Amino acid sequence: MDQYREEHDAIGTVQVPASALWGAQTQRSLNNFNISGERMPSALIHALALVKRAAASVNHDLGLLDENIARAIITAADEVLAGEHAGEFPLVVWQTGSGTQTNMNMNEVLANRASEILGGTRGKGRKVHPNDHVNKGQSSNDVFPTAMHIAAVEAIRNRLIPALEALRKTLSSKSAAFSDIVKIGRTHLQDATPLTLGQEFSGYVSQLDHGLAHLESALPHLLELALGGTAVGTGLNTHPEFARRVAAEIARLSGYPFITAANKFEALAAHDALVHAHGVLKTLAAILIKIANDVRWLASGPRCGIGEILIPENEPGSSIMPGKVNPTQSEAVVMLACQVMGNDVAINLGGAMGNFELNTMKPLIIHNFLQSTRLLADGAESFNTHCAAGITANTVRIKQHLQESLMLVTALNPHIGYDKAAEIAKKAHHEMLTLKEAAIRLGYVTAEQFDVWVDPQKMTEV
């Protein structure tokens, strides 16, 4: 059997591996863009297959595509959606900025596979054409941004939101469990007035609640699809009903309420929806850094750090220091969140690079967007399972810090004034006295008054 076969495109003949389902344009891209090896995300490939399936169905319903050809394309697309033929999509991210080569990769694979389904031979005697049939009424310029939005919505809905909700649930349960544990607060990394450990954790829960709400608010723009705009947004060479119908079919297939974009010129030339949505991902990264950093600081020690919470001992922490346990889940979350922030810069630049009727940074934008959603989802899930769920309070250390804190003196402000309270704190600090001892020696309060006025539990009441 020959190792290669000849495939043809508008430029000429190309040698393609005999076993491959792809065709000439995919092979040209492989030959011309051997850059880094980072392939198009599988989520985008899945979304493209969904687009082609929907388009074939709608074009048939509109009387524009033969029933047998439409059925064959739909069957081939269903195979891709089921995870088959994954090796037939080898193109890298760093290619044409419109994603044309990946669109044609999908067109060629589905055309060759559909031809086989109709009894043809792979790459020969083509019964289904990649452009005339699979890409009918479409352009890479409207197909690729449509797939970008589908992939983004599915990544957010299917992976990111559930992972964040699970972490939020765990932190909420910890907040409730720690509601009666009074501890010292910290501002500017210095001792402050008390709060409960539950109140501290409630802040993390509220951050995630707001982050999830921001995610929801970013979805409506992502639910608008460019398909039907074709080359520049005018809808040239497509049926007047195609855009509306294909959006409805994509909504039916995906289970998400996609609609056709009201203005296709914006949908092709700009990616503001993804820039905005990734701004939310950046915010979520900041939220996770805040939570992860607090956890590792609160767990620092065991003898010489803050040590007010205990985290699970998942693995040895050092190759040289025996018995060391490091906050590895927090470190992983901080790293991945920093990567998301870097991705945000790339997406902002990519989103700004729309020239006239087309943005030509599409692969960059969706590659980074999907990496960010995956990192945040995986990171939240890992942190939840291997760290947050196992957090416990070190009540002995918490009580020690509370008793030693000079900031409890704040409770005396309403009774003796700020200046005298500050004098008590300074005397206690410099002479190594307790606050109570310093207050009595200065003659500002009696022992009985101090015990009534300086009550850490009452100081935490909102």
From Swiss-Prot:
- What top-level branch of life does the organism fall under? Bacteria
- Entry annotation: catalytic residues: 188, 318
UniProt xrefs under Gene3D superfamilies = Fumarase/aspartase (C-terminal domain), Fumarase/aspartase (Central domain), Fumarase/aspartase (N-terminal domain)
Q: In the Enzyme Commission scheme, what number(s) does this protein have?
A: 4.2.1.2
Q: Which GO terms describe its molecular function?
A: fumarate hydratase activity
Gene Ontology biological-process entries: fumarate metabolic process; malate metabolic process; tricarboxylic acid cycle
Q: Where is this site: Important for catalytic activity?
A: 331
Q: Tell me which residues bind substrate.
A: 98-100, 126, 129-132, 139-141, 187, 319, 324-326
Keywords annotated in UniProt = Cytoplasm, Lyase, Tricarboxylic acid cycle
Q: Name one GO cellular component term.
A: cytoplasm
Please name every pair of cysteines joined by a disulfide bond in this record.
none
Describe the reaction catalysed, as an equation: (S)-malate = fumarate + H2O
The annotated pathway is: Carbohydrate metabolism; tricarboxylic acid cycle; (S)-malate from fumarate: step 1/1
Q: Where in the cell is it found?
A: Cytoplasm
Chain positions covered by the region annotation Disordered: 120-141
Determine if Cytoplasm is one of this entry's keywords.
yes
- Its top-level enzyme class, in one word, is lyase
Q: How does it assemble?
A: Homotetramer.
Q: What does this protein do?
A: Involved in the TCA cycle. Catalyzes the stereospecific interconversion of fumarate to L-malate.
Q: Which family does the entry's similarity section mention? A: Belongs to the class-II fumarase/aspartase family. Fumarase subfamily.
The further comment given in this record reads: There are 2 substrate-binding sites: the catalytic A site, and the non-catalytic B site that may play a role in the transfer of substrate or product between the active site and the solvent. Alternatively, the B site may bind allosteric effectors.
Protein name in the entry: Fumarate hydratase class II
Lineage start: Bacteria, Pseudomonadati, Pseudomonadota, Betaproteobacteria, Nitrosomonadales
Which gene codes for it?
fumC
